[in-house]
């Protein structure tokens, strides 16, 4: 039965569990709930019937995540040799893969092709010349530029052929002896309004009709991802309800056309399954303002704040104590970079060094973009179930 409760950012561990885990593994620590990951994947699969689900490895390519999804029968979207190798290590096979990077190095393309990957994406004629030389028997999807009013991040500002170029690009592929099989688009990251898919799908149907009329039969449509996850102070509709609207748009637009549909969700699959456990390692008063320094910051798991415009929820154990006075505080990361500041004017009660801070919904675009700046270790990840 579908729940109609709003989705909120919730931790996969309690503070008692977090303390126990930190005593064994130290912090910062990313904690994966495999059962939550499986639940998210199954919700997407079950509410997009007839749509092939290719998990976007770029969101989180950790072995624990990939192995769990492979065991559930997922397929996978890769963009590089390393992502392909990680997929192989997790048990995926080439027929379960699609390579969706529109701009590939010759090494990236040829190595993935030589290892059996056959589905690729392109968005310009120069990219087609690489396929002629290095991957001539590939099955190609043309990436088309599409945007959404409610997406947090426009993913068509860098990639995607304009719709009015689509027929010319498909024709160019045919002239070069290549095999264009369909279209792809990405509506943008963290798309909050599922009805935005309706406009994009109607546009894609028009392009497919145009191609068919020109003698280029297209048999695949990749609708990308963009399905959202709940972050700080957000209440989103249940994912099942969101996907039901997307599926209704698909049925309305393509119900009369025999076409293979696929999607590439990343954030919606993995975000809510992981919580970061961090510790306060420093405290100071600067011009009357409380500063708290965590053992993880913008160069670690919080790196997702930069590319995804993501505002993570922070939970402290004292938050539930109604008699606690709260202060507008600065929350900073551990590095020497003065820009490594997570929040300003963040309301917190008086905190002490050693106390834990939980950051839920940390599964997507966090570990994936972390680095060891200043020699600070990237948070390790463990699974709790």
Predicted feature residues:
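A charged N-terminal "starter" segment
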Residues: 1-138, 175, 179, 213, ...
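Flexible loop/turn segments at secondary-structure boundaries
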Residues: 61-64, 86, 149-150, 189-193, ...
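Active-site-proximal loop/turn and secondary-structure-junction residues that shape catalytic pockets
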Residues: 36, 59-61, 82, 103-104, ...
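Charged (often Lys/Glu-rich) extended helix/loop segments that serve as interaction or gating elements
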Residues: 245, 257-385
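Structural preference for beta-strand elements that scaffold enzyme active sites
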Residues: 52-54, 73-75, 94-98, 119, ...
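Conserved, mostly hydrophobic/aromatic
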Residues: 37, 58, 80, 112, ...
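Short acidic, glycine/serine/threonine-rich loops at helix termini
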Residues: 66, 89, 109-114, 131-134, ...
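Active-site loop/helix belt of alpha/beta enzymes
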Residues: 146-283, 348, 374
